[in-house]
Amino acid sequence: VKKRIDFQISGNQKCGTNALHNLLDQHPAVRMSSPKELHFFDAKNYCGDESAFQTYHRDGWGLGNGGLESAFLYGESTPKYVLLGPGGEARFLGRIQEYNPNIKHIVLFRDPVERAYSQWNMLRHNGRPVVDFETVVEVGTSAKSPQSSSFNIISRGHYGQICQNLLSLFGPERCCFIRVTDLNHQMNEVTDFLGIAPMNYETRYSYVLPYTSAMSEEARKTLRSYYGPEMVRFGELTGIDAADWIDR
């Protein structure tokens, strides 16, 4: 029996975390949490003692005594864990480091401009109070952007800072950064990172929310320019080619 889970799919929202969670859930050596997003480390009433950790294990994996079997790797997927504070600091990763400094992080990335619009569309579809996307872009890219869910849409695309925070706290050997193209064909990278055998996966249906309108060219151009320095930094830290995400 071990006392800590092994890995987290820590981000990013609207980058394929549902799909990756479902794919890994098919692996015989892996036990993924149910529900997918436990929101343990970002809870407002967070408590980081051993009793709370056992409750976390029971809630996520249905383990009666909170114990984790050594024969399996345990993982969960809460994209909010990589969320940034107003100064770019990690809001929740420090809690995770205290829980398990050896935990591994898998983080997915897609074009940050498309990711932002997808998140805004999801909030709107779910009936959350959200302003129009042009206002999100205008305010979210300003120097004093508020930290509400409407405006952290923009800061979630600060990929360079997100990677810097993870690397500083956990080191490169515990971080797997993936630019998503086709997850089914990228799973060997994930299994190699986790140290488990490769396998064939069954593709499961993933619902994509419809868009009522296309993103305006003005908003797109503003975000391309805004994210440019972050994408350069992201590429330098990860070795991932993000040239096509930069202002063009």
Regions inferred by a protein language model and the residue ranges of each:
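The conserved 3'-phosphoadenosine-5'-phosphosulfate
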Residues: 35-36, 154, 160-233, 239-248
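PAPS-dependent sulfotransferase catalytic core
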Residues: 1-81, 99, 103, 117-137, ...
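Generic structural signal for well-ordered alpha-helices
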Residues: 53-57, 93, 163-164
